[in-house]
């Protein structure tokens, strides 16, 4: 009987030690959980939708096309602002990609059109619109969470660069 009591005590001691070891190891394993840092949202897809492209191609001259480009871009920017207020950041990013494509296309079209009659005024109109849009993009960036703010920061820089490009074309000798 003495032997069986000794065996039971050892078994109890061994099981208590195993239990204590498993508790201490589980907390160490939990501390090693992989912490994934938040990832930035992917950049927006920069494209002009088919219906907008059709409208732009049907414009009768550079002045009408520039006005239409600015109206379409203004619409997309306003929609992106509304979606940002509603915390729908993916949809806002998509609209900002279309906005970016429209503004880049408007400038490139004027450059391709060359120095026709009123292109200087059209470059000035684009520059003035971009000046207003830069403040609105910055306002959206301030209310956007960090994962999407990088895209808005890049768009703000692009808007400033496009504005500079429009100003340089405005003062270029070849544009009249």
What are these regions (language model features)?
Residues 1-9:
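N-terminal secretory signal peptides that target proteins for export/translocation
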Residues 9-11, 31:
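Hydrophobic alpha-helical segments, especially transmembrane helices
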Residues 14-26:
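Bacterial N-terminal signal peptides
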Residues 2, 29-30:
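N-terminal start-of-domain structural block
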Residues 31-176:
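Long, charged/polar, soluble alpha-helical segments
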Residues 10, 16-17, 77:
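Short hydrophobic "helix-edge" motifs at membrane interfaces and signal-peptide entry regions
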Residues 1-2, 20, 116:
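Extended interaction regions within the primary functional domain
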């Amino acid at each position: 009987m003495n032997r069986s009591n000794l065996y039971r005590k050892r078994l109890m001691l061994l099981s208590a030690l195993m239990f204590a070891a498993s508790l201490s190891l589980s907390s160490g394993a939990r501390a090693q959980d992989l912490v994934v840092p938040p990832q930035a949202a992917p950049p927006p897809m920069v494209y002009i939708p088919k219906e907008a492209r059709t409208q732009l191609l049907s414009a009768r001259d550079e002045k009408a096309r520039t006005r239409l480009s600015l109206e379409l871009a203004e619409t997309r920017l306003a929609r992106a602002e509304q979606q940002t207020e509603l915390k729908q950041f993916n949809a806002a990013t998509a609209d900002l990609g279309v906005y970016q494509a429209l503004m880049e296309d408007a400038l490139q079209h004027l450059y391709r059109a060359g120095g026709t009659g009123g292109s200087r005024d059209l470059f000035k109109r684009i520059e003035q619109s971009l000046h207003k849009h830069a403040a609105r993009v910055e306002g959206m960036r301030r209310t956007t969470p960090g994962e999407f703010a990088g895209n808005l920061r890049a768009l703000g820089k692009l808007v400033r660069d496009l504005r500079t490009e429009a100003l340089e074309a405005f003062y270029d000798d070849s544009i009249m």
